[in-house]
């Protein structure tokens, strides 16, 4: 979908968003199994996915940000609290038809804006080194490489007030 000036709204998902979250999460696992630590067949059989529970209970430790085009959920960015009062970014995904529209950057921008609200010092993520599009997107968003392990690059964004 190539729409000029597409209006995207990013926000933390709420209970009413759980069915849409499940659909897009399973889609991400089915279409891009190489990008995630979970797999489609295992996850689709679960009665409740990890983040479904977190969303329903409005956890302040683990958040799922959604990107919406009108009322349709088109992107995800999960945040899990880790040591040193940081969020780890997980389950980053944008629907294929919406790639290249700045939605990933909008999700990362929303994640950065939540650092102050949830009193976190930074964001950490891992990206497969072969995923050049994601890697470039993270660099553009201000993330810096901190280390490498196997075929993954560990990156960090530190909030500076």
Protein language model features and the residues they cover:
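Short, conserved catalytic or adaptor-binding loops enriched in Gly and charged residues
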Residues: 1-5, 57
């Amino acid at each position: 979908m190539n729409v000029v000036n597409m209006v995207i709204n990013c926000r933390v998902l709420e209970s009413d968003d759980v069915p849409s979250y499940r659909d897009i999460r399973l889609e991400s696992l089915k279409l891009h199994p190489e990008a995630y630590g979970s797999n489609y067949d295992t996850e689709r059989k679960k009665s409740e996915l990890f983040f479904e529970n977190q969303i329903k209970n409005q956890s302040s430790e683990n958040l799922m940000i959604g990107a919406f085009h009108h009322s349709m959920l088109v992107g995800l960015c999960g945040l899990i609290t880790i040591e040193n009062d940081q969020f780890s970014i997980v389950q980053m995904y944008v629907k294929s038809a919406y790639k290249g529209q700045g939605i990933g950057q909008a999700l990362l921008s929303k994640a950065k804006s939540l650092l102050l609200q949830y009193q976190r010092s930074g964001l950490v993520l891992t990206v497969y080194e072969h995923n050049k599009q994601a890697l470039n997107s993270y660099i553009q968003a201000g993330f810096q490489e901190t280390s490498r392990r196997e075929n993954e690059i560990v990156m960090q964004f530190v909030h500076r007030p």
